[in-house]
């Protein structure tokens, strides 16, 4: 969802609360929980789940390895759920022509630098740059070239925009900021 008027353009950025992240966090949690239960049932010698009889899996070495994979998977799953809970990477890009300020805001991990804010003058924006990498994994990223800051990505690398959508977005933003477009 974006909001735009004559003087202000606000573009909201979706963070880690995407359907694919929910899907992978659930799959990883359930899979690692299954590994941990099978490893634990082989250690106890009792069937905690009826799918695998505990007599078929000996604790040393299969049970230990499955328990290790289960614990490691639970740690990775908890990391994914934490990023979803904190909505890491979400935020907004605000371009204010009236005040001449560009503000890029993102949420990070909890701590001292939870709020990531970049503010600079609109006159420092030199150009809008479109990077296209063709091949097996096509990647199209929109950058903003800022004097003294370097290039700042405006789109995520996992956003699968068509070439037409990317060109449209770059043209609209360059027109709004009154800067040229560069492509490479």
UniProtKB/Swiss-Prot annotation:
It comes from the Eukaryota. GO terms for cellular component: chloroplast thylakoid membrane; photosystem I. The chain crosses the membrane at residues 22-42, 57-77. Pfam families: Ycf4 (PF02392). It is found in: Plastid, Chloroplast thylakoid membrane. It is a multi-pass membrane protein. Its main location: plastid. InterPro entries: PSI_Ycf4_assembly (IPR003359). GO terms for biological process: photosynthesis. Keywords: Chloroplast, Membrane, Photosynthesis, Plastid, Thylakoid, Transmembrane, Transmembrane helix. Seems to be required for the assembly of the photosystem I complex. Belongs to the Ycf4 family. This is Photosystem I assembly protein Ycf4. It comes from Lemna minor (Common duckweed).
């Amino acid at each position: 969802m974006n909001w735009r008027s004559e003087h202000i353009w606000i573009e909201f950025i979706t963070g880690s609360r995407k359907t694919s992240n929910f899907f992978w966090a659930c799959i990883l949690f359930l899979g690692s929980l299954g590994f941990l239960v099978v490893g634990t049932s082989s250690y106890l010698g009792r069937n905690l789940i009826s799918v695998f009889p505990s007599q078929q899996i000996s604790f040393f070495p299969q049970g230990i390895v499955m328990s290790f994979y289960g614990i490691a998977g639970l740690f990775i799953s908890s990391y994914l759920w934490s990023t979803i809970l904190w909505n890491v990477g979400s935020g907004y890009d605000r371009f204010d022509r009236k005040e001449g300020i560009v503000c890029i805001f993102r949420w990070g991990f909890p701590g001292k630098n939870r709020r990531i804010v970049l503010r600079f003058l609109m006159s420092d924006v030199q150009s809008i740059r479109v990077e296209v990498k063709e091949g097996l994994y096509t990647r199209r990223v929109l950058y903003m070239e800022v004097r003294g800051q370097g290039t700042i990505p405006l789109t995520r690398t996992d956003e699968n925009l068509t070439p037409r959508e990317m060109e449209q977005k770059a043209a609209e933003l360059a027109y709004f900021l009154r800067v040229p477009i560069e492509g490479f």
